[in-house]
Structure formats: C-alpha cells, structure tokens
C-alpha cells in the first residue's frame, strides 16, 4: 500500500480508502467485517462512513453502516492506526423528513449528529468529520444548471464552521472536510477560517471518475494552490465502468438492478462512453475496473481513491488496481474518448 500526507494536517492516508455505503443494505454485518478485515490487512487505513449510510437511505436502516463499523472497531482493537472519516448530513434534498426534524447545519444538529456517530462507531473521536453536502441549494448529486436564488441560506457557512471548530477544540474531531462542494464553497470556507481564526478544511470528497471529470474544472486548481485535496468517490460510477450493465444487462444483486431510482449513470451517452472505455481496457489486456481506478489514483489532486464493493472478489480486484500504472498509449486513448463523451454523468 502507498500512503499520502494530506496538506495542513498530520493525516497520512492510504491512497486507496474503503467506502462503506452498502454496509447495512447490500452487505450484511458479516460481509462488512470481512471487507474491513481484508482491506486493513492490505494496508488500507482510511475508512469512510456517514451518519446517513447505508444508501439508499431509509429510516429503518439509517446508521447501520456506522454501527457495523463500530462493532468491528470494538473487536479489532487498533483504533489509533486507522483514519475514521464520517459525515454530517445537510438538509434533505428530496422533500422527506431527513434524519432529524430540522436538519440544518447548525450547532444543535451538528452536536446531535456527532454524538450519535461517535456512539455508533464506539470511539471518542473522528479523524475527519465532513459536511456531507451544502446547506445552500447548489449543484451536486448530478444536478445540471444553476438555480439562481436571492435568499441566503438559513445557516451560514460561518455558523457551520464555528460549530465544527467547537468540537475540534473539544477533541472529538481532529480535522474538518467537506463533500459534494463547489469551488465557491471551498474558497468561502478557507476565507472564513483565515478571517475568524477557525480551523481550515483539509479535504473535499466529491465524485470523480472517467464518467465525471468535472473536478478538473475549477476545483483542481483550488486543490493545487490551497492544498485541499480530493477523496474521490463513485470512481466506478456505481459499478458502471466495469461494463456489467452494457447492452441492457441487469446483473442479479447489482446496485442499478436493485435500485432503479439511481439513473445518474444510465444515460445513453454514459453507456456509449462506458463501451468505449471498456474496449480500451480489453484491447490492452486490462481489467476495466482497475483501469478506471488507476486513472483516478494517478491524478495529482487525489489524496485517496475510495473503493466500494459488494463482494470480496470486487474488493480484491479493486485493491489490485494499486499495482497498475497506465501506459501513455492507454492514457492517450482515454483522452480521445473524453473529447467525444465529456462529462456524460456529472
């Protein structure tokens, strides 16, 4: 395994991290513990969870992911060797009730969310606590176009950052990060930290893959000059980049087979792009998933590539991508496809 020091922090993360959003839905607790055992044995030290997980979110399963990981941590006994990252949910974006009646990113809700996450995870602190998505209405989760609004968010970024700072001072959070953020949001957090002597955010967790390279426009430059590096998620586009959904295939137990609401990676242009990328991989004797993950890992703004798997075979294949370095010929062919199918699944 390779490791990377995140700027402006003492966090040294494995360049592959373990994503967990299937724990409690597609994966049982026994499955989850087996994945954790294997990942850690391979040198992975970054485990990413969220109070909302598993996905798709349901009241009856909310928090199970953290519970499963917490039970494993209690049994494993090496908490200090691991980097545990969790997330506080923002306001509901689907007009449902959310986790709490008033799911604003204010002091009250952050206090409650953090308390519950620590309890489920059976730990006294989090190495990284991330704002899962912004309080304000903005572009994330595949939203296209920008909806102009004259109203200010009910809770300002300063209020959110000040609340997070309180729990950092209390020793319950080591570092702060954001997720599903924009260049404006990242720069605003950094400006407020400097102006008010508050802790700066050290990471951003956004989607990044061959199907969604929008991070390269704006946020990559912020990452380079401000040192806020990417924890890349959805690097296989819900498994789409493996090619398993091509030609209308619906593999039993696969995420897009089970949950038809997830259409982000199902569009016609996306399928054409996937077919082209899979063709590149096969012509060069590469596993399509490993090629896609190796492309993400090689980007200079990526601190860690988060892996998601529902089977041990998938996890093993994904971790093996660590040993793959893409040739100049492969990279040139990838860029040629990107020129034709640019951001088919933002």
UniProtKB/Swiss-Prot annotation:
- Give the binding site residues for NADP(+): 234-244
Which keywords has UniProt assigned to this entry?
Answer: NADP, Oxidoreductase
Q: Which residues form the active site?
A: 53 (proton donor)
Instruction: Decide whether keyword NADP is in the record.
Output: yes
Give the family from UniProt: Belongs to the aldo/keto reductase family. Aldo/keto reductase 2 subfamily.
Name-wise, this protein is Protein tas
- GO-annotated biological processes: cellular response to amino acid starvation
Q: Which organism is it from?
A: Escherichia coli (strain K12)
What is a single cellular component term in the Gene Ontology annotation?
Answer: cytosol
A single MF term (Gene Ontology):
aldo-keto reductase (NADPH) activity
Q: Which CDD domains match?
A: AKR_Tas-like (cd19094)
Q: Which Pfam families match?
A: Aldo_ket_red
Q: Keyword Metal-binding: yes or no? A: no
């Amino acid at each position: 395994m390779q490791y990377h020091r995140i700027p402006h922090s003492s966090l040294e993360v494995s360049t592959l991290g373990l994503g967990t959003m299937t724990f409690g839905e597609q994966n049982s607790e026994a499955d989850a513990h087996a994945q954790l055992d294997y990942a850690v044995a391979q040198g992975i030290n970054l485990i990413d969870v969220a109070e909302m997980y598993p996905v798709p979110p349901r009241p009856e399963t909310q928090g199970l992911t953290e519970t499963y990981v917490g039970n494993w941590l209690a049994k494993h006994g090496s908490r200090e060797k691991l980097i545990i990252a969790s997330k506080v949910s923002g306001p509901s974006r689907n007009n449902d009730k959310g986790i709490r009646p008033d799911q604003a990113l204010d002091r009250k809700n952050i206090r409650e969310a953090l308390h519950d996450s620590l309890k489920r995870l059976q730990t006294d602190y989090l190495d990284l606590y991330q704002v899962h998505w912004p309080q304000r209405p903005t572009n994330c989760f595949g939203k296209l176009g920008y909806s102009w609004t004259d109203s200010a968010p009910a809770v300002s970024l300063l209020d959110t950052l000040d609340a997070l700072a309180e729990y950092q001072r209390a020793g319950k959070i080591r570092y702060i990060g954001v997720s599903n953020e924009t260049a404006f949001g990242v720069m605003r957090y950094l400006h407020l930290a400097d102006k008010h002597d508050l802790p700066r955010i050290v990471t951003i967790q956004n989607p990044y893959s061959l199907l969604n390279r929008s991070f390269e426009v704006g946020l990559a430059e912020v990452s380079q000059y401000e040192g806020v590096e990417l924890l890349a998620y959805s690097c296989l586009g819900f498994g789409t980049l493996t090619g398993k959904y091509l030609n209308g295939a619906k593999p039993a137990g696969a995420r897009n087979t089970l949950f038809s609401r997830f259409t982000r990676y199902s569009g016609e242009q996306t399928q054409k792009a996937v077919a082209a990328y899979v063709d590149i991989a096969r012509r060069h004797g590469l596993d399509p998933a490993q090629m896609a993950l190796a492309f993400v890992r090689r980007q200079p703004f990526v601190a860690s590539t988060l892996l998601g798997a529902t089977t041990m075979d998938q996890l093993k294949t994904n971790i093996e991508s660590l040993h793959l370095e893409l040739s100049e010929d492969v990279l040139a062919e990838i860029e040629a496809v990107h020129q034709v199918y640019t951001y088919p699944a933002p």
